[in-house]
Curated annotation (Swiss-Prot):
Superkingdom of source: Archaea
S-S bridge residues: none
Name of the molecule in the record: Small ribosomal subunit protein uS4
Keywords: Ribonucleoprotein, Ribosomal protein, RNA-binding, rRNA-binding
One cellular component term from this protein's GO annotations in UniProt: small ribosomal subunit
One Gene Ontology term from the biological process aspect of the record: translation
Primary role: One of the primary rRNA binding proteins, it binds directly to 16S rRNA where it nucleates assembly of the body of the 30S subunit. With S5 and S12 plays an important role in translational accuracy.
Keyword flag rRNA-binding: yes
PANTHER family assigned: 30S 40S RIBOSOMAL PROTEIN, 40S RIBOSOMAL PROTEIN S9
Matches recorded under PROSITE patterns: RIBOSOMAL_S4, S4
Length: 168
């Protein structure tokens, strides 16, 4: 059976935690995307940082190794909805944390008009009123792929869905 893996942090905080411009920018992002704490923001920054690091190392790699890995990375980022179809590694280097935060379920629920505010979207998700293709998702930080984006709706058993059907 084996030993369980050691749980590791999935984020890395800022190197200088008290720089005013960093604090102001983080606070603005927390409010814009309805994040609960800075750890959620740092997790997104870490994911983007890893993608960009991967792209930089691929740009430095020899051509025969680079082609297959580059195609896999670009395909993955396209499926996540972070890049357009004909993107290159230079586009990966231009990714920002806002690009990733736009793909969170919380943001997509708000942008689709299923919630009145970004905070309301978070509450709907946590309380189980939101589903993707009929499957209930209760994590506001869930990264919605390009295929799933059109399938985001109220859960089948949600009273919100029933009230909309009655109005129609």
């Amino acid at each position: 059976m084996g030993d369980p893996k050691k749980p590791r942090k999935k984020w890395e905080g800022p190197r200088h935690p008290w720089r005013k411009e960093v604090l102001v920018q983080e606070l603005k992002l927390l409010g814009t995307y309805g994040l609960r704490n800075k750890r959620e923001l740092w997790r997104a920054q870490t994911i983007v940082r890893k993608f960009r690091h991967q792209a930089r190392s691929l740009l430095a790699a020899p051509q025969e190794i680079r082609e297959q890995a580059e195609k896999a990375l670009l395909n993955r980022l396209y499926r996540l909805g972070l890049l357009h179809e004909n993107a290159s590694l230079e586009d990966v280097l231009g990714l920002t944390v806002e690009d990733l935060l736009e793909r969170r379920l919380q943001t997509i629920v708000y942008k689709k008009g299923l919630a009145r505010t970004i905070y309301h979207a978070r509450q709907l998700i946590i309380h189980g009123h939101i589903a993707i293709a009929g499957r209930r998702i209760t994590s506001p930080g869930y990264i919605v792929s390009r295929e799933e984006e059109d399938l985001v709706d109220y859960a089948p058993t949600s009273p919100f869905k029933k009230s909309i059907e009655e109005k129609a």
